């Protein structure tokens, strides 16, 4: 009898999350309100940030953060191509130009040294990515950005619970976390922007709710002020209390969730140590990995088949996989707009990346099942 399908990711939702949603539904206030306020306070306390603003998605958060910084036509924003397309999309939609930099072949993260070569007088911001749960090497980057007077916005979508040099990601500067369904903590869709810049926080809060001079939920009047006026055109990126209530429970569970992810990842690393598949390398500097993803590189010369054939073979064995990600500059729009971009290490990885199952409700037996499927696939390819 064939085994049931094992997805590459699945949210961990329990009775506490269900009870939290039920409580909000019965409260009579289901959109942005007290749950969202408490989530902001609790998340800021968790990472040691001065300000936290909840939003409906990390894409929306990146949009208003870049806009709040004044990014627009004629500006450049440096970011790796090896990431999800939303950052580059937002840069382009603001009329600015994404400047793509290469990554380390084995960690998939760029570096201050690579970024420095891309800085020009038009550089307005730098968006580094904490990849797959590992921390970006922040100290050299912030030193570089300070020398040039350039703002950094950390893409921390993969980094809930990640730490760098003993400090939680999000403690310094500005960072954006995602609460999408496959992330370490989720509320289906949602995000948190944290920052030590009070003016930026106020502008983001205004832009994410129609440009009104007050938030969707006024903390002083416990409602919406009737005299609220539009201070500038804005958007509708506020997070509902239904979602915030789930995120609050998930935040309380985050340490346990990440500990289970760590245990599963450690077992994968041990079992795949002598396999021709290539897991991502761990950064050499001090950091605490949140293990959002477990990524392999399927090199045809080592494995005897390419990534797509490998994924198809695992699917036939009822094992789900994912790709994180096809490099941004290789997507159709960006190929046409930036035909001369060449990023050798990014491109080498883009055709080889494969994410295998990793989520907190998995067991070590599930890991063994995945490893067994990988081994039988490789044996068949030879």
From Swiss-Prot:
Q: What does the similarity note say? A: Belongs to the DegT/DnrJ/EryC1 family. ArnB subfamily.
Gene Ontology CC annotation, any one = membrane
| Cofactor(s), names only, from the UniProt record | pyridoxal 5'-phosphate
Q: Which residues carry this modification: N6-(pyridoxal phosphate)lysine?
A: 183
The record ties this protein, via Gene3D superfamilies, to: Aspartate Aminotransferase, domain 1, Type I PLP-dependent aspartate aminotransferase-like (Major domain)
Any one Gene Ontology BP term: lipopolysaccharide biosynthetic process
Subunit and partners = Homodimer.
Enumerate the GO terms in the molecular function aspect: pyridoxal phosphate binding; UDP-4-amino-4-deoxy-L-arabinose aminotransferase
User: What InterPro entries is this protein classified in?
Assistant: ArnB_NH2Trfase (IPR022850), DegT/StrS_aminotransferase (IPR000653), PyrdxlP-dep_Trfase (IPR015424), PyrdxlP-dep_Trfase_major (IPR015421), PyrdxlP-dep_Trfase_small (IPR015422)
The enzyme's E.C. designation: 2.6.1.87
Pfam families noted in UniProt = DegT_DnrJ_EryC1
Q: Which SUPFAM superfamilies match?
A: PLP-dependent transferases
Q: In which pathway does it act?
A: Nucleotide-sugar biosynthesis; UDP-4-deoxy-4-formamido-beta-L-arabinose biosynthesis; UDP-4-deoxy-4-formamido-beta-L-arabinose from UDP-alpha-D-glucuronate: step 2/3; Bacterial outer membrane biogenesis; lipopolysaccharide biosynthesis
Name this protein carries in UniProt? UDP-4-amino-4-deoxy-L-arabinose--oxoglutarate aminotransferase
Q: Which reaction does it catalyse?
A: UDP-4-amino-4-deoxy-beta-L-arabinose + 2-oxoglutarate = UDP-beta-L-threo-pentopyranos-4-ulose + L-glutamate
Q: Does the keyword Transferase apply?
A: yes
**Record keywords:** Aminotransferase, Antibiotic resistance, Lipid A biosynthesis, Lipid biosynthesis, Lipid metabolism, Lipopolysaccharide biosynthesis, Pyridoxal phosphate, Transferase
User: From which domain of life does this come?
Assistant: Bacteria
Query: What is the documented function of this protein?
Result: Catalyzes the conversion of UDP-4-keto-arabinose (UDP-Ara4O) to UDP-4-amino-4-deoxy-L-arabinose (UDP-L-Ara4N). The modified arabinose is attached to lipid A and is required for resistance to polymyxin and cationic antimicrobial peptides.
